[in-house]
Regions:
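A nucleotide- and high-energy phosphate-metabolite-utilizing enzyme signature
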Residues: 1-193
């Protein structure tokens, strides 16, 4: 009842990625049914775009974030250090990074799942992007660019985590991916219903 009547947009964004990991078949079936019902609800597209855009702006305005990394104390890092004097890019939180890809995917699912219920089936970004493409919501090129950037970022992130490093790379290391993701982000956020 809460998810249908009172939940915030960000809670529905999180539901796009949610999946049951433990429970009886009956319980996991109920969860999947509720998740699908919430995701497939028809929404005010302009309000959705405003909510997602405002959420992302708040994240970017937050100049520092707290991150815990294995074997390291709590440290503060800029979300986008390339805007400071340090030429670094946060592959997760920086503009054109993983969060932007996730927000793009979540926005498209929440915007179109009432028409294409298969968009509510998967909870991982790669298969959701494939579904968005197969339903004509993403072009082949946009889907390809998002998947490639997401896979590149994840691979790079795993390598950094194995070295107990924060998810920061030199700003010039991911410029192609960043440009492609920010271009798609701009298109999605400018779409009005």
């Amino acid at each position: 009842k809460y998810q249908l009547n009172n939940a915030w947009t960000w809670e529905h964004q999180a539901l796009v990625r949610a999946r049951p990991i433990v429970g009886t078949p009956v319980l996991t079936g109920k969860f999947k049914s509720i998740r699908s019902k919430v995701l497939c609800r028809n929404r005010d597209h302009n309000q959705l775009i405003n909510d997602v855009s405002n959420m992302r702006k708040k994240m970017l305005e937050q100049l520092t974030i707290e991150k815990r990394t294995p074997k390291k104390p709590l440290l503060k890092t800029n979300i986008e250090r390339s805007s400071a004097n340090l030429p670094m890019f946060d592959i997760k939180y920086g503009e054109g990074g993983m969060i932007d890809i996730e927000f793009i995917v979540q926005t498209k699912v929440l915007s179109h799942a009432h028409q294409f219920i298969d968009l509510a089936h998967w909870s991982d970004n790669i298969r959701i992007i494939d579904s968005l493409e197969s339903n004509g919501i993403f072009s082949f090129d946009d889907a390809k660019n998002l998947k490639e950037a997401y896979i590149d970022y994840r691979s790079l992130g795993h390598k950094l985590q194995l070295q107990n490093e924060p998810l920061l790379v030199k700003a010039n290391q991911c410029t192609t991916q960043r440009k492609k993701v920010t271009t798609i982000w701009s298109k999605v956020i400018k779409e009005k219903g």
